Structure formats: structure tokens, C-alpha cells
Amino acid sequence: MEWNDKGFLIEKKRYNENSLLAEIYTENHGKVVGLIFGATSKKIKGYLELGNFLHVNYKYKNDNKIGYFNVE
């Protein structure tokens, strides 16, 4: 499954070397937790500050498992 939405970054935790476990409050789907791969890269690091407004693409394989975000 996949969906696109807008939301605010409300929590982030470091996961492995270059990923984040992020909690985003979205307009249509509420509070969603997912991984952001490559979150420590120079290109995306500036966008991932708490409270920032983000356009996200969320992909997941199963409703019971965590998915991952692509941030725009």
C-alpha cells in the first residue's frame, strides 16, 4: 500500500547509521510512525527538524508492520 499526505514531524529517533525512526502527524491519516532511510545525508538533513511541515509518501506491505517515508 502507498499514500501521499502532508504533515508535521513531531518526533525523531536515530535508527542505525543513517536512518531515522520518525513520527509524523498527517492531515488525513493522523499520527504515523515510519523509517526514513538516508536521513543523515546533507540533502535531506535540513528538512528533518521537529515541527517542520513535510510532504510525505508512505509505503508499507502490511498494516501490522512499520513502513517507510519518502520525504519531499
Q: What positions do the PLM features span?
A:
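A surface-exposed, charged beta-strand/loop segment in the N-terminal or early-internal portion
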Residues: 1-72
